[in-house]
Structures are given as structure tokens and as C-alpha cells.
């Protein structure tokens, strides 16, 4: 056996192994390549089917053969999905906001299309036409689709869509404007809906009629009774303009596709997190204030008696605010502020400049649209927007409207939720004045003026009247006139001076007591600021020849003497004065008497701030004497309150007989003390009846004096 044969066998074996390995490697690569090619072809056949439908062009597309085949294939393949797409569109139109935005997009596109026509007759569609409930969308099919676009065909039908339009006709002589009511009947018409995804913005939805539909229009002027002259446009012309605008327009709207946190709770299968407190929500603008509204470069032809106003319209929720009209001119500025409530869906704000015409209508000169409601924008900024001319109007290219936008921040969880907070008391001082007037049969007028003054503050203390103004509410009751037989206690005035009532008072006194004790319409509330003033005015029984000051001082001295008589009767024997001149001091003595000094010392600062002085009351009422009581809180007196004043006023005329007993005190000022005590005037009886029952204490405190 040849030894070289073994070496040659080993070499051949090694070559065979290398060849087999190479062959296996090549087969493996071939199988892998074939598998990848097969998978790519399978996936490409599914994905490129609609895309390949858009590739062929030329004569096939022009002849419509390829399109017919594609439509047939698309219809057959999308038949199971038609119900789903139709249900999606129906669900979107079920939302009020989507439906309103859809209608608003229609109106905006119609107005833009109508403005493109350069004829002398311009039409303007007013927002917002009512969508009929019978409007339906059917036969929804997908005819084209790519990575970012989709084209749908659907059938739209609506019955009697009613909306108003404004028609403006310009002529060399004048400009006329009239409103028309339009009734539109839309038969089943095919509509093409295009969906396009725009990065970082949302989904752009646009629609248009594939073919010219057969529209049925009925146009009626708003003022049918007015005779139409030659200057008014023909109804047929208006109908043609409306049809052209509806058919030629292509509305579009943007649908937001940004992700947001779900407002609902967690998924039931998930467990709630262990966090004790949720992070507070970020506040966002909830209220928008428009300030310093200004329209510039409007044109030099504006002026005269015309007036301009600015209207601000928010898209969602729909709001409209107007400014006060200002005199027209090239530069117009409105000083008042406009407030608008923003919502989560607020996107656009429209500013309109309107001109008031001679017939009372408002003509749109121009408008501008600016975005609002974005949390990323600054909270306060100044915005300058160019004005787009209104229908049939011409403005300067430099016409602008300027507004300062100020956002007021608020938390979203507080929107629409009433917060229960304690109402803050009003810090404005209030004063309520009630007047009650009664006219007695003899002509005596009994008037009670009750003043309730409140000065609430945050700390609960009363403030000075000079620090803050007061709100005064005056309530005057109906004047009561008593006849001869309808006195307070059915007592005739013709009775003698000694015929008193069962309680010892005459009709004047009873009327005064009734007015002071009668509950008023307000709630009974004890307050240290309540003050009642009783004014009794009438005629004097004897001529007044004395000086005014001497008469008032003498009257005060007589009251003081009567109090000394009462004190002497209850406390111990005292000799009554025998001469009026001895008991009635002169003007100088009366002003410098210890009693006056003592009363001045006892008058506290609160009494001065709460009650007006006697001089002030006398200057207003012309009284000849005043009687003011001190605090009666510790005494059993029902009708006299703290700060009650009895003011007796006389009239400068005479009456000889049949006068009220309340004016006996004027005649008793010059009589002797014995005659004055025997006569028993009204003032003495009133003081005796309501005098203090308690005796002076032994500690030396002075007895209260009236």
C-alpha cells in the first residue's frame, strides 16, 4: 500500500468538508434571503394597496377606468368598516362643541368666499345657522389613505336649514343694507371629507361638494311691508350669490389630538397609589380682560355724526361683549374694559369694529382674530392685529386694532363650583332715617325722626363719622291726619284742659308715645347708634315778645324748677320758688351755671360722636328748646331710648282759643310757680309720669337730670 495514498485521502477529505461547509453556508444565506423577500412582499402587498391606487395616472385616470376599479375595490374591502366610520362621525356630531365649531367653520368660510367676489352686491352670513335635527350622514367610504392623510366620501342630506344674511349694495349715490331670511333645502348630496395630520397642531378636517348640488333656496326680506325701490337688489341675484358661495366654499377646522390626563378615576384592575396627597393642579387662565382697545388708520372719510363701537366675541363658550359707541374718526379709542370667561376649549377671540348707521343697524367695518387661552403665553400682553375689511368695505392696509390682554389666573377645580365662604360684612357705614308725622286736629304736628346708624369695621369697633362716608337711606311714612272725632283715644279736642285720658295723657302725648313705641319695618335690634328725635310743632297761645334766647333759657329754667319740686316731694321738704326771676337765671347765669358744667362733664366722647348737638338740630328745625335724656338702660322706661330728644318748635303766628295743651309751657314761662304747677302743662306731666323711681344714692352720685 502506498503511503502517499493516505496523505492524499486526508487532503481530499478536507476539501470535501470545506466544499460542504461552503455549500451549506450559501444555501443558508439563500434561504434567509428568500424568507425576507417573501415577508417583505407580503407586507408590501397589504400596505401599498391604497398607495398604489394613487400612483397610476395619465389616460387611465382621465378615462376613469382605474378610478372605477379602485372605488369598486375600496368599496368591497371597506364594507365591514363602513359602519364603524359612520358611527365615529355620528358620535362626533353628537357633541355640542364639535357641532358648533363645524357650523362656525361653515359660516367663516362662506363669508370669506363671499368677500372674494368683487361685485357691488355683497352678502354676509350671520352666525350661527341652526343645524336641523334631521340632518344625516350616510354611505361613508374610504377612497384614499396614506401615512398622514385620508379621504372619505359620504352622503349629506338636510331639510330646511334657516339662517339670516345681510346684503349690502354699493352705488355712487348711497350704500343700502338689508337683512334677508334664507331657507335652504339640501337634497342627498355627496360630500368629500379630507383628513390631514399636521404635526404639533392636530388633525385638519376639510370638506367640499364633489359635484354641484341642486340647492333649493327661498329668500325673503326681513321688512316685507316696506315698498321695495329700484335701489334694492333683485331676489334672484341674491339667490345666485348664495348658491355660488355655498357650492364654491371649502370649510376647514382643526381637531386637537394632543394627549391629556384622563379626568376619570383609575382603571379598576389597577391599585390606587400609596401617595397620601395628590399634586395640586396647575392653575390656568379663567378670565380675560380686554383693556385699552384702539382702532388705528381707519381712514379719513370716517367722521361727522357717525359712531364706532368694538365687539369682542369668544368662540367657546360663545360670548359677546360690546363697548360704548365713540365718535368716528381715523383713530378711535375705547376706555372701558371688557371681561370674558375663558373655558377649556377657548381658542379664538374675534374683535369687530362696527359703525352705527342712520337706520339703527350696525355695519361691520373690519374684524381681527387672535388666539387666546394658551397657558404657555404670558399673563398680560399687548396685541396688535391687522383689520380685515368687512363685506363691501374698504380699509387702509395699515388699519389695525390694538388691545391689551390680561389673564386672571384660577384653578380648574374651582370652575363652575360655588365655594362656601363666610360673607364679609360691609365696611361702608350706613344710616337709616325714618320719619313718622301725625297732624292733630288743632294743627299741632307731631314728628318722630328715628336714625339708626351703623359703622361696622373688621375689628368690630365703631369708626369716626369723619373718616368714612355713610350711605343714607331715608324712609318717610305716610302722614297721618287726625280729625276732631278720630283722636288717638277717641277724645274730642273740645273738652276742657282737665279732661285727660285714662292714662293721664292728652292726645299729643299719646301720639308721641305711639310713634316712639310703634315697631318699624326693620328688625328689632338694640344698637347704641339708634337715636329718636321727637318734634312737636304748633302755634303759640300768646304773642311772643321776648327775645329768642331769653325765652329758651327761661323754658329750660322752668323744667329745672319742676325737677327740683319733684325731688323735694320725694326726698324731703323744700320751699318752692316764689318769684320767677329768682328761679329763672339770666342768660349769663344760665350759661355759666354748675348744672351746665356738670352736664358738659358727663357728656362722653361717644355721646358726642353718636348724637348731633342741640345747636345742629336747632339750626335745622328752628326749635326754641331741647330736652335730651341720658342713658335709661337701668330704669323701667319703655319708650324713651338712649339719645331721645324732645324738641318743641313754635310757629310765628297766634291762635287765641282751642289750642293743644302741649303749648301751655310757653305761657307758663312768665307765670308764677304756683300758677305753673296748678296748670299742669304737658311737659310737667310727661316728666312726672316718666320720672325716675329710684332715689339718689347716699354715695354722693348726682341724680340724672333731663
UniProtKB/Swiss-Prot annotation:
One of its GO terms (cellular component) is endoplasmic reticulum membrane. Signal peptide: none annotated. Its main location: endoplasmic reticulum. Pfam families: C2, SMP_C2CD2L. Residues 1-9 are lumenal. The chain crosses the membrane at residues 10-30. Residues 408-430, 452-503, 564-682 are annotated as: Disordered. The modification Phosphoserine is found at residues 59, 358, 374, 411, 464, 468, 470, 613, 619, 623, 638, 660, 662, 674. It is found in: Endoplasmic reticulum membrane; Cell membrane. The modification Phosphothreonine is found at residues 417, 419, 428, 621. One of its GO terms (molecular function) is phosphatidylinositol binding. Keywords: Cell membrane, Endoplasmic reticulum, Lipid transport, Lipid-binding, Membrane, Phosphoprotein, Transmembrane, Transmembrane helix, Transport. Residues 602-614 have a biased composition (Basic and acidic residues). PROSITE patterns: C2. Residues 417-430, 483-494 have a biased composition (Low complexity). Residues 31-706 are cytoplasmic. GO terms for biological process: positive regulation of insulin secretion involved in cellular response to glucose stimulus. Residues 76-260 form the SMP-LBD domain. Phosphorylation at the C-terminus acidifies the protein and leads to disassociation from the acidic cell membrane. Reassociates with the cell membrane upon dephosphorylation. It comes from the Eukaryota. It is a single-pass membrane protein; Peripheral membrane protein. InterPro entries: C2_dom, C2_domain_sf, C2CD2/C2CD2L, SMP_C2CD2L. Lipid-binding protein that transports phosphatidylinositol, the precursor of phosphatidylinositol 4,5-bisphosphate (PI(4,5)P2), from its site of synthesis in the endoplasmic reticulum to the cell membrane. It thereby maintains the pool of cell membrane phosphoinositides, which are degraded during phospholipase C (PLC) signaling. Plays a key role in the coordination of Ca(2+) and phosphoinositide signaling: localizes to sites of contact between the endoplasmic reticulum and the cell membrane, where it tethers the two bilayers. Homodimer. The SMP-LBD domain is a lipid transport module, which binds glycerolipids with a preference for phosphatidylinositol (PI). This is Phospholipid transfer protein C2CD2L. It comes from Mus musculus (Mouse).
